[in-house]
Structures are given as C-alpha cells and as structure tokens.
C-alpha cells in the first residue's frame, strides 16, 4: 500500500532540512526561497522494533520493512493559487499526496531569513491555508457549474451534488478548510473526484530550537492553541537536531546524543508514527526463512483485503489465513511452537486483521 505525505510550508521554515533527515534523498537546503525547484521524493523506512524481533527469531534471508513516500513541496507563498512564486504546479503536487505535513517555523535565528521578515507561525499557517482554500474553491466552483447544468435537466445525482457542493463552497468562502465542512459520511463522496487540498488529513510540525524540543516554546504553544478546534496533532521537532542525529554513524552514538537532550527517540520516528495514525494505518507481518516482511494496511481491513496488498491473486483466491498474534509468536519463539501451543488460529474472509498479526495466507486461483 503506497503512502505519500507532502511536506508543505513557507520558504525557509526548515522544510527541506527535515525532508533530508527523513529520506535518503538530499534536497538542497539553501537559505533562500525556492531552493526546492522540483518536488523531491524520498522513501522512508518505517521503524518497527517488532520487525527486528521477528527477524532475530526467524533469521530470514532478507528483511523488508514497510516504507512511506515523502514529497518535499516547494515553498509556497502568498498568491500561489494565482501562480505566484512556484504556484499552480506545486499545488498540483500536493493534490497527489495522501496527507499533509505542515512545517511551521517556531524558532528565532537572525541568520535565517523569513519571507515576511519576522517569526509568526500562525500568520504562516494562515497564509498556506488561504492559498489551499482558494485553490479548492476554484475546484468546487468548476464542478458546481457542471452539477447545476445536470440538476436543471432533472438529474437526481446533479441535484444532490449541488446541495452538498454548495455547503463546501460556503465553508471555503468563510476561510475554513474542507475537512471541517459540515458534510458527513457518504455525502462527502461529491468531492472524491476533485481531490480537495484542504480535505486531506494534516499534521503540524513545529520546527523548534534545541532548547525547546522537549517542552516547546511560546511559538509552539500558540500553534497548539490555534489548531485545537481542528483536532490535529502537533509535533515538536528540531530539524537542526535531526540533522545532527542523521550525521551520526553508530546507533550507540545516536542514542547517547538523544539521551543528552532528554529524548527517547529521534523526531523523525515520532513523525512517521504520527503519519500512520493520521492515515489510520496498521502493520501486519509475514515471516518465513526466505523473508520477514512488514505490510501496511488500513485499519479495519479484512484478511482477504490484507492478502490483496501482497498480490491481487491472494485476495481473489483467498481460502484462509493462518494467524498468530505477535506477542504469542515472540513468547513461543517460532511458528511451529506457537502452533503446538494452540496459538495459531485459522481465520476466514470476515476476519479483521489486527495490528502486529503474523499471517500466512492460503489461496487458490
């Protein structure tokens, strides 16, 4: 299952520095606007201690973690929706992502210029929100015009679309994002085909200085208060610290560095886990001598759907799923031992896969 998060923010908020820490790709982190001319795409390995533990027990030929794609979207500026700065092209890049990671500058540094001349994360957030909302309003307007023509012919679908698109339009005109529009459940399908930017789930990252990475600062507190109503998660990360961690070769050095700062894990790990929560994802495992592998699924997926993530044939010809809970696998040390102790269950088509399940699918095509 592909998962793509777009990192957005005004120029010089620490977006590309954070991206460099997250991925194997290296964007040019320069102290001037628009250093990210093309959207950089990086692939992040999702850290999971359970995968490491299973690998120790099974000793496979290879270990395959699950990954997340991160896209570094060029710095947006006022007027982006009208083509200013790098404009429409990059709003299009955001449209292709599953979720938005919004980086806000929450540190003072006279050596790093700010496009608006001062540090104000709420102003920065509102600038980005406004540009995305304007672009969404344009998309809703276009579809609404088509739906109104259909409605005039007596088309039921057209009338329904007009009703709910009008709600989205009014909501956006009030300077609010589509994700908070008062439209529930299946009625939101009227916007499925136009992929509204502000309907995507969002995670806010406060890029703070080293001294504020544990408890935050005045800027991050303002951000937390401002996004309360959205119900969005806010993370404290120091891109500068993450850069230092990434430059350390040994795990021991990294752990020692983190401990000195009062941290238990790198900020990028917290960010990846938060992205999982944001998209309602979970992980199951396959474990054999050839390969131990982590697979990403959406929470609530049934066994056949989870099997389909490996290959569509697995879903089409699904017969059953031999399932061991992760804790049982670790407790008994192997699939055979778990089976002997009655901890291997045979699950059918209705089984909802649990996070951490170790699975073996039987199928016939």
Task: Map each language-model feature to its residues.
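Amphipathic alpha-helical transducer elements in NTP-driven molecular machines
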Residues: 34, 48-51, 64-70, 84-98, ...
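Short, flexible surface segments
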Residues: 96, 354-355
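A ubiquitous short alpha-helical element
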Residues: 58, 128-132, 239
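Short amphipathic alpha-helical segments
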Residues: 30-31, 112-116, 216-218, 248
């Amino acid at each position: 299952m592909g998962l793509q998060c777009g990192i957005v923010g005004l120029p010089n908020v620490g977006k590309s520095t954070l991206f460099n820490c997250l991925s194997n790709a290296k964007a040019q982190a320069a102290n001037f606007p628009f250093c990210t001319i093309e959207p950089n795409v990086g692939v992040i390995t999702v850290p999971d201690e359970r995968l490491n533990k299973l690998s120790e027990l099974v000793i496979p030929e290879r270990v395959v973690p699950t990954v997340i794609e991160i896209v570094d979207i060029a710095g947006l500026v006022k007027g982006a929706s009208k083509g200013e700065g790098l404009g429409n092209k990059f709003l299009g890049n955001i449209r292709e992502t599953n979720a938005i990671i919004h980086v806000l500058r929450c540190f003072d540094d006279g050596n790093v210029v700010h496009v608006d001349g001062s540090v104000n994360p709420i102003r920065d957030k509102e600038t980005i929100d406004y540009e995305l909302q304007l672009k969404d309003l344009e998309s809703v307007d276009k579809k609404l015009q088509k739906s109104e023509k259909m409605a005039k012919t007596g088309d039921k679908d057209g009338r329904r679309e007009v009703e709910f698109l009008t709600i989205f339009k009014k909501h956006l005109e009030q300077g609010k994002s589509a994700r908070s529009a008062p439209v529930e459940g299946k009625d939101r399908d009227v916007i499925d085909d136009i992929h509204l930017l502000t309907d995507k789930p969002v995670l806010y990252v406060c890029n703070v200085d080293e001294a504020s990475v544990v408890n935050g600062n005045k800027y991050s507190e303002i951000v937390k208060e401002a996004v309360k109503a959205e119900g969005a998660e806010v993370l404290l990360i120091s891109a500068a610290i993450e850069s230092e961690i990434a430059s350390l070769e040994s795990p021991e050095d990294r752990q020692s560095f983190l401990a000195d700062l009062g941290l238990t894990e790198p900020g990028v790990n917290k960010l990846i886990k938060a992205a999982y929560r944001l998209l309602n994802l979970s992980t199951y495992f396959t474990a054999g001598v050839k390969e131990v592998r982590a697979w990403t699924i959406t929470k609530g997926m049934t066994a056949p759907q989870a099997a389909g993530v490996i290959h569509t044939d697995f879903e089409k010809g699904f017969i059953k799923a031999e399932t061991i809970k992760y804790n049982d696998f670790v407790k008994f040390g192997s699939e055979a031992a778990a089976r002997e102790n009655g901890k291997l269950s045979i699950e059918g088509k209705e089984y909802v896969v649990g996070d951490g399940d170790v699975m073996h699918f039987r199928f016939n095509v």
